[in-house]
From Swiss-Prot:
Tissue expression notes: Highly expressed in brain. Expressed in all neurons. Also expressed in testis, primarily in the epididymal epidermis.
Organism: Mus musculus
Protein name in UniProt: C-Jun-amino-terminal kinase-interacting protein 2
Biased composition (Basic and acidic residues): 233-249
Compositionally biased intervals (Acidic residues): 77-105, 333-352, 471-490, 541-555
Region called JNK-binding domain (JBD), residue ranges: 111-278
Top-level division of the source organism's lineage: Eukaryota
Triggers of expression: Upon neuron differentiation.
SUPFAM superfamilies registered for this protein in UniProt: PH domain-like
CDD domains: PTB_JIP, SH3_JIP2
Residue span, SH3 domain: 610-671
Assembly behavior: Forms homo- or heterooligomeric complexes. Binds specific components of the JNK signaling pathway namely JNK1, JNK2, JNK3, MAP2K7, MAP3K10, MAP3K11, MAP3K12 and MAPK13. Also binds the proline-rich domain-containing splice variant of apolipoprotein E receptor 2 (ApoER2). Binds the TPR motif-containing C-terminal of kinesin light chain. Binds the cytoplasmic tails of LRP1 and LRP2 (Megalin). Interacts with DCLK2. Interacts with FGF13; enables the interaction with MAPK13 and may regulate the MAPK8IP2 scaffolding activity. Interacts with TIAM1 and TIAM2. Interacts with SH3RF2.
Bias (Polar residues) ranges: 142-172
GO biological-process terms attached to the record: behavioral fear response; dendrite morphogenesis; JNK cascade; MAPK cascade; mating behavior; modulation of excitatory postsynaptic potential; negative regulation of apoptotic signaling pathway; nonassociative learning
Length: 830
């Protein structure tokens, strides 16, 4: 159970941690700022989340329960909370000590309204309704020093699980009733806890408009084992004393508390100061710990079961409170959840801020109009009361109401979204006559919250996603991929979207086989990949369905011979927007260099002689004089002369220009000639093949049939955007013991004199498609960094001879390298 919680904490909240908190050795591929790589890892079942530092784990640990709920509650070390009630006989011994601490907390809470109160300890600032009562310190391992973490954490739910509370729309409308709370029922079973519906509470201390409410009237209820004075302070701070338009979301009090006017007035002053402190913490842009605590509070309040008071209907004469944000309705086109990039400038933080999820949760909670629901895996709703439904009808819009049961909130963790359904029985599926807006927490790698409008007779599809990690270009590519793959007969839903209906099981051809074609095994071993229709995706357009229905044996010729895929295709068109990972490694003067160009050595013909690059640009250099050379990152540079003033005179192989540039703007690359100095003989054979280059994409692993398949799929999908504009990069593959050389043979004067070389020692994996051998790819490692790229080729004929040639070259190179690097004589000498 602890392993599951640990895995969820690493996979979900790694994206919520700020980049500055990650260790320097964390070189996750999220730094490349590309969603396509995350889709590749989602397809292959890999994860890009790495282990975060211990401070980050402690600050993000939330729940304290033995049984994992289908909500956002998890922890690193589970604790037992029966000790709270087992040690009740020790209350009399610590009563005097508790009263002194509460008096200190009362004095500090009055003076804690300024920003200077952030440094105060959280334990001393917890208010209590009465000075005569004693509240035992709860066991916790959070040790958060900020104020916002201790005010609203309720982790005393180990042995006292309350009845399933109603939805948060109802509890917001409740008034602070003076009635004592009912006695709690017996603890729920683990199966019932799986169906336990939780409520989401708004941000403590201020309303959704940022205004601080006036001091609330003092009120207290009966005893509740799971109550906490800190939560009571936060919950009571939501009630408005002057307008009475807002009701407290929950009525909680400490054990043995009575209604006292003096204690209530003192509590109101403490709540006011604590609210100001929390508002200062949550609005501070430079305090990352405050944001972490606030996010922890929001999710912890939503995940902590609490006692449920008697509902009291809201008077009808009170005007409804105007929300600060637009509600999410079925016909509301101006909703912020659909605005996408238009709403990004309105965010209070940076577009790449990892705390965007906290902002969205706060907005969603404050609006009170759209529930979070997991499509296809919804949990059973809690029973509804007629009084609660009547009180809910006063504030919920009419288009969002359900005639049978009103909206409810369900927070589902990422393990529930990605894994199999929980053993708890699922709720009955809503029919076509019960449409309603649902917010779907989708794609955990991007922190995207996408609205799904479940319309009758149509499977809900995500619209514009309000995510800071997705740009307009990537959203267009994602929508294009979804449209193309849904038109195919055996298509699979892309990783970035999920449907509300039940997903059809994958057929046998889409299951990844464990057989791998590594370069050191027998040359007859083949690579088992998925079907070409999903992998290539070149014929998935609706107007070309006839080419999709071709047989698997004729799929390669049909796809390459169709009108939509001429024999010339290239991914590097500057007019269209797509990911930089799909840019051709052979770039011309109209497009920028791709990040995969540094994986090999560039060479071109200079003054009638083929020269290889000697340096690689590591910074961008903009010339300010006529004799200076423009450089971009990863540009291949041939240094012809080194000046004394730390300036180089060289030739930019990408642009074909000469000039001078600072010496520190380029780094030397290891050439293949240096590696072959110890070789006893020169390469005796060279195989040449005429193929077409499709593109390169960066991958997270150096081998794997799933990695190669996903790379082919992404490259082929990106090719559909540019197949009508540019001819393909027709190239000659020269395979030898030195490596693989890609020489361009057509397309322009730049292409005729340029080539790319990958050293054999950096090639780690290769293979062709078993059902359509016209597709071939190999994975190379960066010469200096721990980065990998996959290069995909296509041909009119079978590419199996290319795979056998690469395997043969690698086998001979490996044997020769072992004989040179590890001679057997040294073993006997020692």
């Amino acid at each position: 159970m602890a392993d599951r919680a640990e895995m969820f904490s690493l996979s979900t909240f790694h994206s919520l941690s700020p980049p500055g908190c990650r260790p320097p050795q964390d070189i996750s591929l999220e730094e490349f700022d590309d969603e396509d790589l995350s889709e590749i890892t989602d397809d292959c079942g890999l994860g890009l989340s790495y282990d975060s530092d211990h401070c980050e784990k402690d600050s993000l640990s939330l729940g304290r329960s033995e049984q994992p709920h289908p909500i956002c509650s998890f922890q690193d070390d589970f604790q037992e909370f029966e000790m709270i009630d087992d040690n009740e006989e020790e209350d009399d011994e610590e009563e005097e000590e508790e009263e002194e601490e509460e008096e200190d907390g009362d004095r500090q809470g009055k003076a804690g309204g300024g920003p200077g109160s952030q440094a105060l300890a959280g334990d001393s600032l917890i208010p209590s309704p009465s000075l005569e009562e004693s509240h035992k310190l709860r066991p916790t391992t959070l040790h958060l020093t900020t104020l916002g973490a201790q005010d609203s954490l309720n982790n005393n739910n180990g042995g006292f699980t309350s009845a399933p509370p109603s939805s948060w729309q109802e509890t917001v409308l409740r008034s602070p009733a003076q009635e004592p709370l009912k006695e709690l029922p017996a603890p729920l079973l683990p199966a019932e806890e799986e169906r336990h519906e939780v409520q989401s509470l708004a941000r403590p201390g201020c309303d959704c408009e940022g205004n601080q409410p006036p001091e609330p009237p003092a009120s207290s209820g009966g005893a509740s084992p799971s109550s906490d004075p800190g939560i009571e302070a936060d919950l009571r701070s939501h009630s408005s004393g002057g307008h009475e338009g807002r009701r407290s979301s929950q009525e909680l009090s400490s054990p043995g508390s009575d209604s006292e006017d003096a204690g209530g007035a003192r509590l109101g002053r403490m709540i006011s100061s604590i609210s100001e402190t929390e508002l200062e913490l949550s609005s501070d842009g430079g305090s990352s710990s405050g944001r972490s605590s606030h996010l922890t509070n929001s999710i912890e309040e939503a995940s902590s079961p609490a006692s449920e008071p008697e509902p009291e209907p809201e008077p009808l004469h009170e005007p409804p409170r105007r929300p600060a944000f637009l509600p999410v309705g079925q016909d509301d086109t101006n909703s912020e959840y659909e605005s996408g990039s238009e709403s990004e400038p309105d965010l209070s933080e940076d577009a790449d801020s990892p705390w965007l999820l906290s902002n969205l949760v706060s907005r969603m909670i404050s609006e009170g109009s759209s529930p979070i629901r997991c499509p296809g895996q919804c949990l059973s709703p809690a029973p509804r009361l007629p009084e609660e439904a009547a009180s809910q009808a006063n504030s919920v819009p009419q288009d969002c109401q359900d005639p049978e049961a009103g909206p409810h909130v369900e927070l589902v963790d990422m393990d529930t979204l990605c894994g199999p359904p929980p053993p708890a029985p699922a709720a009955p599926r809503l029919g076509p006559a019960q449409p309603g807006p649902c917010l779907f927490l989708s794609n955990p790698t991007r922190d995207t919250i996408t609205p799904l409008w479940a319309t009758p007779g149509r499977t809900a599809r995500p619209g514009r996603s309000c995510s800071a990690a997705c740009s307009e270009e990537e959203e267009e590519d994602e929508e294009e991929d979804e449209e193309d793959e849904e038109d195919a007969e055996d298509s699979v839903v892309p990783p970035g979207s999920r449907t509300t209906g039940s997903t059809a099981p994958l057929d046998a051809s889409l299951v990844y086989d464990a057989v791998k074609y590594t370069l050191v095994v027998d040359e007859h071993t083949q690579l088992e990949l998925v079907s070409l229709r999903r992998c290539a995706g070149l014929g998935n357009d609706s107007e070309e369905d006839s080419s999709c229905e071709a047989s698997e044996e004729e799929a390669g010729a049909t796809l390459l011979g169709s009108d939509q895929v001429p024999e010339d295709a290239s991914p590097d068109s500057p007019d269209l927007t797509f990911s930089k990972k799909f840019l051709n490694v052979f770039v011309n003067s109209t497009s920028r260099s791709s990040s995969t160009e540094s994986f090999g050595l560039f060479s071109c013909v200079v003054n009638g002689e083929e020269r290889e690059q000697t340096h690689r640009a590591v910074f961008r250099f903009i010339p300010r004089h006529p004799d200076e050379l423009e450089l971009d990152v990863d540009d291949p540079v041939l240094v012809e002369a080194e000046e004394d003033d730390f300036w180089f005179r060289g030739f930019n192989m990408r642009t074909g220009e000469r000039g001078v540039f600072p010496a520190f703007y380029a780094h030397a690359v290891p050439g293949p000639a240096k590696d072959l100095l110890g070789s006893k003989r020169s390469p005796c054979w060279v195989d040449r093949f005429d193929v077409q280059f499709l593109g390169s994409v960066e991958v997270p692993c150096h081998q794997g049939n799933g990695i190669l398949c996903a790379a082919m799929q992404k490259i082929a999908t990106a090719r559909k955007l540019t197949v009508h504009l540019r001819p393909p990069a027709s190239c000659d593959l020269e395979i030898s013991l030195r490596g693989v050389k890609l020489s361009l043979s057509g397309g322009g004067p730049e292409f005729q004199r340029c080539s790319h070389f990958f050293q054999m020692k950096n090639i780690s994996f290769c293979g062709c498609h078993p059902r359509n051998s016209c597709y071939f790819g190999f994975i190379t490692k960066h010469p200096l960094l721990s980065r990998f790229a996959c290069h995909v080729f296509v041909s009119q004929e079978s590419m199996r001879p290319v795979a056998r040639s690469v395997g043969r070259a690698f086998l001979e190179y490996y044997q020769e390298h072992l004989a040179f690097a590890c001679p057997t004589e040294d073993i006997y000498l020692e």
